[in-house]
Amino acid sequence: EIFGFDSDMEWDWGLPWYRPTRILHAVIGGEYGWRSGSGKFPSYYADTLPAAADIGLGSPTGVKFGTKSNFPEKYKNALFAMDWSYGRIFAVHLQPDGATYQGTPEVFVKGKPLNVADMDFGKDGAMYFITGGRGTQSGLYRVTYDGEKMKEPKKSDSELVAEKKKKKARE
C-alpha cells in the first residue's frame, strides 16, 4: 500500500477549484486529478479517485505509519502526516472502504512555531521529529507513550513450535 500527503496550491485558496491538502491512497491506474490552476479535476468525476482524507490548508512534508511505535494500538495503526506551515502532526485513522480507505484526521502534535520537517520512530518506540527550514531554528523532538505498558500479543502454536526448534538448533 502506498499513501501520500498531497499539497494544495495556496494561491488557489478561495477560488472554486481550490483543493485542500489531502491524504491519498495510491492505487494502480489511479487518477487523482492533479492539474494546474482551474484545470483541476474535481474528485466527483467518475474517473478521478477521491482523497482518503481532506486535511485543509497546510504544507505537507511527509508521512509515516506508527507500526514501529510503542503507542497504543489506535496510533500503531495510524498514518502520521506532517504539516510544516501550521506546525501540526496528524494521526490519520484509516478504515477500509472497498478497494481503498477513508481516513479520519486527528491533531496529534501541535505547536507555534513547529515547522515539522521529518519524522521517524526509534528502536525505543518513540516518535522523533525535526523542525527547521527557510532560515528558522532547527530542533529535535521526542514523543513517547507514558501510559500502561502494552501487552505482547499471544503467539500462535506454529510460532511457539518454530521458536522451540530454533532454540534446540542453537543448543
Please describe what each predicted stretch is.
Residues 1-171:
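Beta-propeller domains with acidic blade repeats across secreted/periplasmic ectodomains
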